[in-house]
Structures are given as C-alpha cells and as structure tokens.
C-alpha cells in the first residue's frame, strides 16, 4: 500500500512532508529526515585519514573514493 501511495504522489506532484524551517517539501518522510540534516550543525561522518567531515554517509563514501584513503 505504501509503495502505491508514494508512486501516486510522484505522478501527481503531491508533497505532503514539509520542512518547518524552510520551504522544502517532499513525497516521503525519509527524504524529509535526510533534508533536516541540512539545518543541523552535526557532522557525524568523519574521514579517519584527514579532517573531512560531513552530514551525509554518501558524501563520505564519495570522498573516500575520490582521495583513495
């Protein structure tokens, strides 16, 4: 059922999940939770080989690939 609701929201442009801090809105709660990190000052993903730190796991993975740490 949830997959169908998500699918229909994508087709009809419905974005019921809204950020309380800015005008961002999205189709599901996990996307909103990811977006909320952009308002935080918490950089929980850190490179063990340099001073790089990020809010997002995928950004750290890209960093590690780019610099071959």
Curated annotation (Swiss-Prot):
Q: Which GO terms describe its cellular component?
A: nucleus
Query: What family does this chain come from, according to its entry?
Result: Belongs to the hunchback C2H2-type zinc-finger protein family.
Q: What does this protein do?
A: Gap class segmentation protein that controls development of head structures.
Q: Single Gene Ontology BP term?
A: segmentation
GO MF annotations for this entry? DNA binding; zinc ion binding
Starting at the broadest rank, the lineage of the source organism is: Eukaryota, Metazoa, Ecdysozoa, Arthropoda, Hexapoda
Q: Which organism is it from?
A: Apis mellifera
Q: What is this protein called?
A: Protein hunchback
Q: Which InterPro entries match?
A: Znf_C2H2_sf, Znf_C2H2_type
Q: Where in the cell is it found?
A: Nucleus
């Amino acid at each position: 059922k949830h997959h169908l609701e998500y699918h229909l929201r994508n087709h009809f442009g419905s974005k019921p999940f809204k950020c309380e801090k800015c005008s961002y809105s999205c189709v599901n709660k996990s996307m909103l939770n990811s977006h909320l990190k952009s308002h935080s000052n918490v950089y929980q993903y850190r490179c063990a080989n340099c001073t790089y730190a990020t809010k997002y796991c995928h950004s750290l993975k890209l960093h590690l690939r780019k610099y071959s740490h």
